[in-house]
Amino acid sequence: MLTLLGLGMILCFMYLIMTRRMSALVALTLIPVIFALIAYVLGFFFDSLSHIEIQNLGEMMLEGVKKLAPTGIMLLFAILYFAIMIDTGLFDPSVKWILRLVKGDPLKVTLGTITLTLIVSLDGDGSTTYMICVAAMLPLYKRLGMSPLVMACLMMLSSGIMNLTPWGGPTARAASALHVDPSDVFVPMIVPMICAIAWVYFMGYMYGRMERKRLGIITLDISHGDNIQISSNPEANRAHLRWFNTLLTVVLMICLVKSVLPMSVLFMIALCIALVVNYKDINMQKDLIAHHAGSALNVVGIIFAAGIFTGILAGTGMVDSMSKELVAIIPESMGPFLAPITAILSMPLTFFMSNDAFYYGVLPVLSEAALHYGISPVEMARAAIVGQPVHLLSPLVPSTYLLCGLAGIDFGQHQKFAIKWAILTCLVMMLGGLIFGGFPFYSTLP
């Protein structure tokens, strides 16, 4: 019964936001509360639900919010930081350079989007990647009249592939859950990742051709490129301090990669330094923060609402129940195929549950079963990270809300547009893993 309620809650949520009957903030808050109350009432009739008590629901929700609080704080100050950097004109030269390079060709823009995202996402953090890449590319998409849905899709897929580096979350979780070395998981997956990257470039080429056909190669007056500004607030431009802002941002990125301090603290410090150096007038500092507060609070509000969703999902035992039931339905005759089965399951399972729930709850059970057929834990770990491009479309991923907010697109629209391409990207990576020996298609007892 817990499994049915968990699946019902997730499917109901997905339906409401994809059909735009509810906003993500409202759905993430109300739907889990309603299903938790349903579970409480059904607990009088089903023993499997008798452990759910009304007085415990608040603790479950608060626990979920606490877990996502650092992420919410980080996003609040990160959005404000990059918004201030845009106002100062930090990214104006990069946009001008890209503008001169693409010369109004949508095909070059889509391919450039992928390249930029692949490079920036090497730091392993999706939120930072989206903030930098959207800041650089969105003005160009708007100027050419290209669809921001295409931009968001290409960025998400590129980030999903590059997030498989050893310092990225999925590989580290899979390795720690199965007690294997992250480098042993990652190195054999390099070629499959290259295959997936090649596929994303093909997608970018295809969409670039479509946008070129729709819009044509637009003639941009490059001679006026020096007048191009990303910011809509020219009074906040600080071109003479660009060297300082560049240095500050580079140091911030290095500190993020080296984990010198928690991300939220680093962005808080960097934001305060940026405000003090660039804007001496306290009133101007207040005005700029107020100007960007709307977009920041919109994203952060969704993050805290997601805490309620995940808190109830985990606290009621729905996640554990779903993982056990899904593992149990795999017939014993399919045991030798557990590696590709795990790769396929990683798509829906990491969509419907968090990475932590999948890698620490489901993967060890699958890996233990696979051992009986001669499939090693490291091979299972490689198979388990294949579904990450689909995972990034999950309503449980905070950075996806950030991407949609920055790009100015609806979360449900993004899901509908990108889901088929995310699945195909995962399948290409899985095929690469099978062909190049990342994990076996079929295995027997050693």
Language-model segments: residues:
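Long, contiguous bundles of hydrophobic transmembrane helices that form the permeation core
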Residues: 3-9, 28-31, 35-39, 43-48, ...
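Membrane-interfacial loop-to-helix junctions in multi-pass transporters
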Residues: 1-4, 66-72, 98-112, 143-151, ...
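Membrane-core helix-loop-helix motifs of multi-pass transport proteins
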Residues: 139-225, 230, 235-236, 376, ...
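Transmembrane alpha-helix interface/packing and boundary motifs in multi-pass membrane proteins
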Residues: 13-21, 82-83, 116-125, 156-162, ...
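Membrane-helix interface "capping/anchor" motifs
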Residues: 15-26, 141-150, 280-281, 290-291, ...
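Core transmembrane alpha-helical segments of multi-pass membrane transporters/permeases
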Residues: 57-92, 118, 264-265, 272, ...
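Re-entrant/interfacial helical elements at transmembrane boundaries that shape
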Residues: 93-95, 128-140, 168-178, 322, ...
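Hydrophobic alpha-helical transmembrane segments of multi-pass integral membrane proteins
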Residues: 74-77, 103-136, 329-373, 377, ...
